[in-house]
């Protein structure tokens, strides 16, 4: 997950920094650091990704078409 994907995912879910921090169990400063492009420890990044994925976010790799996110269909 890139900083841009993090911001895109938050926007798609209508989450603020505080919402994401709460869902991931990290500080708001950690989210701010991620979105600034600062390196985070892998376990911390994993927790943030897992919070997004639990909310239905799918991360789209660049694959020549550009990075992105989408919200998975709920069955």
Whereabouts are the PLM-identified features?
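N-terminal acidic leader/helix
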Residues: 1-4
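Short basic helix-loop element that most often maps to the first helix and adjoining turn
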Residues: 6-19
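Key DNA-contacting residues within the recognition helix of helix-turn-helix
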Residues: 7, 32-33, 46
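Residue-level recognition of specific faces of alpha-helices
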Residues: 16, 30-33, 51
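Residues in the helix-turn-helix
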Residues: 19, 30, 44
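DNA major-groove recognition helix of helix-turn-helix/homeodomain DNA-binding modules
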Residues: 25, 42-60
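Recognition helix of helix-turn-helix/homeodomain-like DNA-binding domains
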Residues: 25-40
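Helix-turn-helix/homeodomain-like alpha-helical modules used for DNA recognition
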Residues: 57-75
């Amino acid at each position: 997950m890139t900083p841009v994907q993090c911001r895109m995912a938050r926007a798609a879910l209508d989450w603020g920094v505080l919402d994401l921090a709460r869902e991931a169990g990290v500080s708001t400063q950690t989210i701010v650091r991620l979105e600034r492009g600062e390196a985070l420890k892998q376990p911390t990044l994993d927790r943030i990704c897992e919070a997004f994925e639990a909310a239905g976010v799918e991360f789209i790799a660049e694959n020549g078409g550009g990075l992105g996110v989408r919200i998975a269909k709920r069955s």
